[in-house]
Regions:
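Conserved acidic-Pro-Pro-aromatic motif
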Residues: 37, 43-45, 96-103, 107-166
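Helix N-cap/coil-helix junction residues
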Residues: 16, 94-95
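SAM cofactor-binding core of SAM-dependent methyltransferases
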Residues: 1-88, 100-103
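Distinct, well-ordered alpha-helical segments
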Residues: 83-89, 112-117
Length: 166
């Protein structure tokens, strides 16, 4: 869907050459990955987190040629201090101002992002529900498996939505 090209252009404009990332909802590390192109072709390092054990095992296998990538099995939760994003990043010794955060957990994306307070990635990638308008002022009243992302709501101070691909 063009994500690799969008990401490459943004990293070029920000002058990020050999960066760091965290991708959770990493799946098998290749399919639907927002960071694999950077790992494979730009020698990026970082953290891939996948909750599903089978997909995690595939990710471990697929990332064997890339020792700069840590692969973790577990869930990233917004309402559990032991498994929130800050804790995962802290345990993995991630830099406070790492380059890319890719969120693709098919639920609670907004709440996980909202509760990340200790780290400040330069670029944040969200999954959107392509069946809905990506810019709407609506959010489920409670966390759910409905992955609706409101681009305007995702903007934290100093952040601007740059694009959306379907």
């Amino acid at each position: 869907n063009g994500e690799d090209g969008i990401i490459e252009q943004i990293t070029k404009e920000l002058n990020i050459n050999n960066g760091t990332f965290c991708e959770f909802g990493a799946s098998n590390g290749i399919t639907s990955s927002n960071t694999f192109n950077l790992i494979k072709n730009k020698n990026w390092s970082g953290l891939a987190i996948e909750a599903d054990k089978n997909r995690y095992n595939l990710c471990v296998e697929n990332y064997k040629p890339y020792p700069n990538v840590q692969i973790k099995n577990g869930m990233v939760l917004f309402n559990n201090a032991e498994y929130n994003l800050d804790k995962w990043l802290e345990k993995s010794n991630m830099e406070k101002d790492f380059d890319i955060l890719s969120i693709d957990i098919d639920c609670d994306d907004y709440y996980v992002w909202e509760n990340m307070t200790q780290f400040n990635p330069k670029i944040v990638i969200f999954e959107v529900n392509s069946y809905r308008d990506p810019v709407f002022d609506e959010l489920p009243r409670k966390p759910s498996t409905e992955y609706n992302i409101d681009l305007l709501r995702q903007q934290k101070p100093g952040r601007v939505a740059q694009g959306c691909s379907f």
